[in-house]
Regions:
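Outer-membrane beta-barrel transmembrane domain signature
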Residues: 84-197, 201, 207-210
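Short, flexible coil/linker segments at or flanking structured domains
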Residues: 12-14, 19, 37-39, 68, ...
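Short glycine/proline- and aromatic-enriched beta-strand/turn motifs that initiate or cap beta-hairpins
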Residues: 29-83, 207
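A generic structural signal for short, solvent-exposed coil/turn residues
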Residues: 25, 41-43, 70-74, 89-91, ...
């Protein structure tokens, strides 16, 4: 059911699907030999580039986390993110600093800049079959223009808001540099603490380690 729901959502946004599909497919022929050669040193990669995109989802973060969401407008975004792992404890947990540059399409056309610190859990019992991580990040977010969908949520919406993300990555041990990404991209004022309004974007993409 979860996979069918995601396919139904993303089938409505062919531009996002096209960009992410091309990004996923094109590098693989050149990457396989290099990745297989470096399989034992995957934990030594400290830099990560993530490309992801998806639609604006309603009604709130809680529903999006539970995949109980609806897509009610023609607003979606694509984001490129660069992260650096600055601390790791064995193969259990790591911390990263990440900067992002995003672009909106459809109903909105502004840009977005984000910066965050990420905590990532690395240890799962099935990792030798499907390498898996779960991450939570928090930081700040700036829109180059006030978002209309965030104004619909609250008339006092502004450019600066808190940024929060939840992310799952899945990959094959044979290709240690590459992972599939599902990321929830969330902006909010933390109940008015740093601003008003908010938005949620359930996104898919890929992550490349180097």
């Amino acid at each position: 059911m979860l996979i069918l729901r995601l396919l139904m959502i993303y089938s409505r946004f062919p531009l996002v699907a096209l960009v992410l599909s091309l990004a996923l497919l094109l590098p693989l022929p050149n990457a396989s030999a290099d990745d297989a050669k470096n399989e034992d040193t995957a934990e030594q990669y400290k830099w990560f580039f993530t490309l992801y995109g998806g639609p604006h989802a309603q009604p709130d973060l809680g529903h999006v986390l539970l995949f109980d969401m609806s897509i009610e407008d023609d607003t979606y975004m694509i984001v490129g993110a660069l992260a650096y792992e600055f601390w790791r404890y064995q193969d259990y947990i790591s911390f990263e600093a990440e900067g992002q540059l995003g672009k909106f399409f459809g109903q909105e056309h502004q840009g977005q800049l984000n910066a965050q610190v990420i905590a990532r859990w690395l240890k799962f019992p099935w990792n030798k079959y499907v390498k898996t991580t779960f991450a939570v990040g928090d930081g700040f977010s700036y829109n180059t223009e006030v978002s209309d969908v965030e104004k619909d949520d609250d008339e006092g919406a502004g450019r600066w808001l808190n940024y929060l993300m939840f992310e799952w990555t899945l990959g094959l041990p044979k290709y240690p540099r590459w992972d599939f990404v599902y990321r929830i991209h969330h902006r909010s004022g933390i109940a008015g603490l740093v601003g008003d309004g908010g938005s949620n974007y359930p996104t898919i993409g890929f992550k490349y380690a180097f």
